[in-house]
């Protein structure tokens, strides 16, 4: 096992150990025991930067189930190390922050167990090379995030948010699994880097488009893109450390990682480029618009997170256009990848800090309601400084890092509207328009976030707690992030060569990537767009009280949340009614549905798939065989029309004995003897049972009832006959009987082939069948014994009552 494997497994192991430590060290905050884990992992991944910076990749294999191609393979390149550093780096700061945020009276054992479980799952997602292993870790992130969001399970809103996130992300996970299976079938491999290497062949597969759609669904649900974004605002009911971790740097970025990782596979598709870019931009616009009307600080950050995720998603779509050009023109669109990678880091820094400050404000004032907050500038000066730096970075104001990636984003959007491919040079004009409008509202909610907390009139009577500055433990992590916002804004070169360029190379497949970010590079269309954003943003701020009423006037019934809640309300009743319509307690009705579907599926298959009948190897039919068949048919018909149960059982026995005679004709004496014995026993049991059964009324059967029975019976008979003839006439493989003939003696040392097959070749099958019969027999015996005890107890009670 390599160090890379240990890095993934380590948080999962400690997730099991930490709750045990909590029992013995309750006087010490459990976070101090957890903190070294992400710190050590962060240092380890930092040591690997030199490897990925030089263009090398690391592949580590650990055999698990190699016979089905399912191994614990890890793949480290510039993209995966970027996400690994975010997961462990932000994770370290979140754990440090949680020590000040969560008191010792909380269920810290559970909290840190869930947090480490999530951290290990995220590392597994970004480092796994095997598609099935990646999917398992993907679902583990959904499960662990459900536990984290519902941590305060006494609150109904927490349970509701956790359930919603689980339902939507698991739906995406199932779609993702389907996409992975299809793409692995198309590429004949479960290895992600092998599939990317064979992208040119996979793109011609008929499964390509279906795999692409399913994988996009998985990515969109995880990264909260329109229309699946509705789970993220409700997930804000989680403790603030969870929100700062999951919704700034980790879980919501998993979908972005997936899109970036599989871009080399799907970038050739016009549908991929248009869908990824357009969905991202619509998400940016819609979420930024909704963020402006939120009355809860976390609500603002939730929708701002959705909008920023849409922004990064659209950048990845723009970058995919580079696969259709070469040379300098390709470099123009690779700027989309570099902007996406750089903004991934920038968003983690400023959004993580903003979540932590929001938690600090909530912690010291007791509320996040913007109507009750305000005037905290002099009371919380350190928090104010951090908020100004990070919120202005989110708004795209220099000299902070958010401005640099926003400029590159606008530059890429303007360039794409001139691309002479997939009609982007005509229809692509919608891209920069959506980008600019979304950025205007981003500017508005970023400035309003500062004003809501620190400006206006202080209302001490409206606050549940007396406001004061947060503790140093709660401020240390956001201070570090705010410093990084400034440093990366002034010195972007610290990231470009070590992080941005290797990650961009991993996505684009080009080795000569040159990522450059400058605070000012002349009067360009992107800079002019920025000026427009600032001017219109200021105008909207000045007229905020007028136009915000229009947003609040939106009918609730037109929202996606209303549709989600309505579906959750009515779906169980609808499903129950549908189920009750065919699962009504009548065996006959269930059989009609089952056999009816069998007939329909068989007919559709026969009409769509060519087949033929081949009778060349069929032996001659003798007169005595025809006689037995006629007897069998007559007996079966008499079973159906019999008026007496006794006569029906006798005719059923005739059917069974006729089959045993046919086995004798076909030279299968063992089968004939078995059939004869079974038929004799079953007939005797039937007669014994019927002797004890009460007389039942015979219901009048309608004509439609009889007609349905007749059609189903005839249909099933024809299906079995046709399938049997087709199977006989279309033998594409050597009969397995030849294998048994060749090895029945030398492997099993037996001469009776049937017995050897049952006892040796299919011995386990026979054993389990016998076990099932034994269990059924025990069940019947238990029921009879309990009935006898019940009857005897009733007799005793009656005797005592008489006495």
UniProtKB/Swiss-Prot annotation:
InterPro entries: CPA3_Na-H_Antiporter_A, MrpA/MnhA1/PhaAB, MrpA_C/MbhD, MrpA_C/MbhE, ND/Mrp_TM, Proton_antipo_N. GO terms for molecular function: antiporter activity. The chain crosses the membrane at residues 1-21, 30-50, 79-99, 117-137, 166-186, 208-228, 265-285, 300-320, 337-357, 377-397, 427-447, 472-492, 522-542, 591-611, 621-641, 646-666, 671-691, 707-727, 764-784. One of its GO terms (biological process) is sodium ion transport. One of its GO terms (cellular component) is plasma membrane. Keywords: Antiport, Cell membrane, Hydrogen ion transport, Ion transport, Membrane, Sodium, Sodium transport, Transmembrane, Transmembrane helix, Transport. It is found in: Cell membrane. It is a multi-pass membrane protein. Belongs to the CPA3 antiporters (TC 2.A.63) subunit A family. May form a heterooligomeric complex that consists of seven subunits: mnhA1, mnhB1, mnhC1, mnhD1, mnhE1, mnhF1 and mnhG1. Mnh complex is a Na(+)/H(+) antiporter involved in Na(+) excretion. This is Na(+)/H(+) antiporter subunit A1. It comes from Staphylococcus haemolyticus (strain JCSC1435). The lineage of its organism: Bacteria, Bacillati, Bacillota, Bacilli, Bacillales. The gene is mnhA1.
């Amino acid at each position: 096992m390599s160090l890379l494997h240990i890095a993934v497994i380590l948080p999962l192991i400690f997730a099991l150990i930490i709750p045990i430590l909590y029992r013995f060290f309750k006087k010490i905050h459990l976070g101090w025991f957890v903190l070294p884990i992400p710190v050590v992992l962060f240092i380890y991944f930092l040591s690997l930067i030199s490897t990925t910076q030089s263009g090398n990749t690391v592949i580590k294999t650990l055999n698990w189930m190699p016979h089905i191609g399912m191994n614990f393979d890890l793949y480290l390149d510039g993209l995966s190390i970027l996400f690994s550093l975010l997961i462990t780096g932000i994770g370290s700061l979140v754990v440090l922050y949680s020590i000040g945020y969560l008191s010792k009276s909380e269920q810290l054992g559970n909290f840190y167990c869930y947090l480490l479980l999530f951290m290990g799952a995220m590392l597994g997602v970004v480092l796994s090379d095997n598609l099935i292993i990646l999917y398992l870790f993907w679902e583990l992130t959904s499960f662990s995030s459900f536990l984290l969001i519902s941590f305060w399970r006494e609150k109904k809103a927490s349970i509701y948010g956790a359930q919603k996130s689980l339902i939507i992300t698991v739906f995406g996970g199932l779609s993702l699994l389907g996409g992975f299976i299809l793409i692995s079938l198309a590429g004949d491999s479960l290895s992600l880097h092998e599939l990317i290497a064979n992208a040119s062949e996979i793109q011609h597969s008929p499964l390509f488009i279906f795999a692409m759609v399913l994988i996009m669904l998985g990515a969109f649900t995880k990264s909260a893109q329109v229309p699946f974004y509705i789970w993220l605002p409700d997930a804000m009911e989680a403790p603030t450390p969870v929100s700062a971790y999951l919704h700034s740097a980790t879980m919501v970025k998993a979908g972005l990682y997936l899109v970036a990782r599989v871009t080399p596979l799907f970038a050739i598709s016009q549908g991929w480029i248009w869908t990824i870019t357009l969905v991202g931009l619509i998400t940016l616009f819609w979420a930024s618009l909704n963020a402006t009307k939120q009355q809860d600080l976390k609500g603002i950050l939730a929708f701002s997170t959705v909008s920023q995720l849409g922004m990064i998603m659209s950048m990845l779509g723009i970058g995919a256009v580079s696969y259709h050009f070469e040379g300098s023109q390709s470099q123009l669109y690779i700027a989309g990848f570099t902007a996406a990678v750089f903004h991934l880091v920038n968003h983690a820094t400023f959004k993580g800090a903003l979540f932590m400050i929001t938690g600090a404000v909530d912690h010291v004032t007791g509320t996040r309601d913007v109507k009750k907050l305000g005037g905290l500038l002099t009371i919380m000066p350190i928090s104010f400084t951090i908020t100004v730096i990070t919120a202005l970075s989110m708004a795209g104001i220099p000299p902070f890092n958010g401005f640099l990636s926003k400029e590159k984003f606008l530059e890429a959007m303007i360039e794409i509207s001139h691309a002479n491919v997939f009609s982007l040079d005509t229809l692509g004009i919608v891209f920069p328009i959506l980008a600019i409008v979304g950025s205007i509202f981003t500017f508005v909610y970023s400035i309003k976030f500062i004003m809501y907390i620190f400006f206006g009139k202080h209302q001490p009577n409206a606050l549940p707690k007396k406001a004061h500055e947060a503790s140093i433990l709660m401020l240390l992590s956001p201070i570090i992030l705010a410093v990084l916002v400034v440093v990366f804004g002034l010195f972007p070169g610290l990231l470009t060569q070590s992080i941005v360029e290797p990650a961009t190379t991993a996505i684009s497949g080009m080795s000569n990537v040159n990522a450059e970010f400058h605070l000012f590079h002349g009067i360009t269309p992107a800079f002019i767009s920025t000026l427009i954003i600032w001017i219109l943003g200021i105008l909207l701020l000045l007229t905020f009280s007028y136009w915000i009423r229009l947003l609040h006037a939106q009918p609730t019934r037109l929202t996606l949340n209303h549709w989600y809640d309505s579906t959750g309300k009515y779906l169980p009743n609808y499903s129950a009614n549908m189920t009750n319509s065919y699962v009504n307690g009548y065996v006959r009705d269930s059989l009609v549905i089952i056999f009816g579907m069998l007939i329909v599926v068989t007919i559709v298959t026969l009409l769509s798939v060519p087949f033929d009948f081949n009778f060349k190897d069929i032996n001659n039919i003798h007169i005595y065989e025809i006689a037995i068949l006629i007897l069998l048919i007559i007996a079966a018909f008499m079973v159906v029309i019999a008026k007496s149960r006794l006569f029906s059982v006798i005719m059923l026995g005739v059917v069974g004995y006729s089959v045993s005679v046919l086995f004798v004709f076909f030279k299968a004496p063992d089968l004939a003897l078995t059939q004869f014995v079974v038929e004799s026993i079953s007939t005797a049991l039937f007669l014994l049972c019927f002797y004890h059964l009460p007389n039942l009324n015979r219901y009048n059967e309608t004509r439609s009832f009889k007609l349905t029975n007749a059609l189903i019976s005839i249909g099933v008979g024809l299906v079995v006959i046709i399938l049997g003839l087709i199977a006989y006439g279309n033998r594409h493989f050597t009969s397995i009987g030849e294998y048994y003939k060749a090895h029945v003696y030398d492997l099993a040392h037996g001469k009776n082939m049937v017995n050897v097959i049952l006892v040796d070749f299919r011995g386990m099958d026979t054993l389990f069948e016998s076990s099932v019969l034994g269990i059924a027999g025990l069940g019947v015996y238990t029921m009879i014994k309990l009935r006898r005890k019940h009857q005897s107890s009733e007799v005793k009670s009656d005797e005592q009552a008489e006495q």
